[in-house]
Amino acid sequence: MKFTELTVTEFDNFVQNPSLESHYFQVKENIVTRENDGFEVVLLGIKDDNNKVIAASLFSKIPTMGSYVYYSNRGPVMDFSDLGLVDYYLKELDKYLQQHQCLYVKLDPYWLYHLYDKDIVPFEGREKNDALVNLFKSHGYEHHGFTTEYDTSSQVRWMGVLNLEGKTPETLKKTFDSQRKRNINKAINYGVKVRFLERDEFNLFLDLYRETEERAGFVSKTDDYFYNFIDTYGDKVLVPLAYIDLDEYVLKLQQELNDKENRRDQMMAKENKSDKQMKKIAELDKQIDHDQHELLNASELSKTDGSILNLASGVYFANAYEVNYFSGGSSEKYNQFMGPYMMHWFMINYCFDNGYDRYNFYGLSGDFTENSEDYGVYRFKRGFNVQIEELIGDFYKPIHKVKYWLFTTLDKLRKKLKK
């Protein structure tokens, strides 16, 4: 085996293998994204004795104090069950970094630590991957910990994932809780549609994202941050928009209303109606009253807000391994139409149609108590019967130890001065 720099082609060919469970940050498209952010990129990996790539990682080189922080965002990519391979990688990486002006290195691999069901009950027969964590520590890495909160300096450590293997949309939907099924069906009955946005329409996503940002108070990303991905990831970034055409909805409602009124009139015309028939008439009267109310509201909304209402939108990444929900927004004013539910249902079906076995709702804090900052997000994802995946976390290692001590000391002083 040998540790070496890789070409873009070598790197790309390797990470395209879905069995390696790579992340959307460990793809060739992210090279240009990181370069656009002003960072150099280096591709490092291992080749076996037949010159075949068996490990790969995309590193950003972040200039710091005359040296570089080497950060492999969600790397490296390899068969992490092969502890001997991981051991060799970490040993050889250390040698490489000592020769290439590294201040310290950060790794946050897309590697599983533990697996749970939606209620945070560990899967039977699964064990915590402490062997990997201990292996990193044996190479001098500091573990950032088994965190259970969001941290702006770290990638998420907990995820909610739908395993689609061996399922169909119909069988999968049966595993959702009653609220998820009901709200998806509501959106379908409203006639909510979903389409993918082009780059020149991306402002429609941003409008919904900014509205949600203001409402929820989360840490937002800039427009340029999103456009950087849109411009570099090509067809690996997907932006669905859930919307409703009120003109079509009003027409559908009117047709249904006419049908119910005709049925009611026919039943009323019969003589000697039974109690059962009278109950049916009463039920139809309720439905007619409801539809008339809906028709009036939809007509008024169309006059004030226009016939097309944008309900929800999201940014997704698709790579060889999965489709991953990255970020999204929705309109609170139109939440009756269940736009987010339709968007997720559409994208789940996209996975089935395009051969993906994983639909990743992505981030959770890891605090699943009712007082947690994202308990509502957890409940939403839990309702889809997700499996909860816990990743092994962040690892740091100083390479230039004297300069790293100075760097951390100055950083602590800066933080004290800010306070």
From Swiss-Prot:
Biological processes per GO annotation: cell wall organization; peptidoglycan biosynthetic process; regulation of cell shape
Catalytic activity: MurNAc-L-Ala-D-isoglutaminyl-L-Lys-(N(6)-tri-Gly)-D-Ala-D-Ala-diphospho-di-trans,octa-cis-undecaprenyl-GlcNAc + 2 glycyl-tRNA(Gly) = MurNAc-L-Ala-D-isoglutaminyl-L-Lys-(N(6)-penta-Gly)-D-Ala-D-Ala-diphospho-di-trans,octa-cis-undecaprenyl-GlcNAc + 2 tRNA(Gly) + 2 H(+)
Subcellular location, record wording: Cytoplasm
Domain of life assignment: Bacteria
Function in brief: Catalyzes the formation of the pentaglycine interpeptide bridge, which is characteristic of the S.aureus peptidoglycan. Adds glycines 4 and 5 of the pentaglycine bridge, using glycyl-tRNA(Gly) as donor.
Keywords: Acyltransferase, Cell shape, Cell wall biogenesis/degradation, Cytoplasm, Peptidoglycan synthesis, Transferase
Family: Belongs to the FemABX family.
EC number of the protein: 2.3.2.18
Chief subcellular location: cytoplasm
GO molecular function: aminoacyltransferase activity
One of the record's GO cellular component terms: cytoplasm
Enzyme class: transferase
Keyword Cytoplasm: yes
Quaternary structure and partners: Homodimer. Interacts with FemA.
Protein name: Aminoacyltransferase FemB
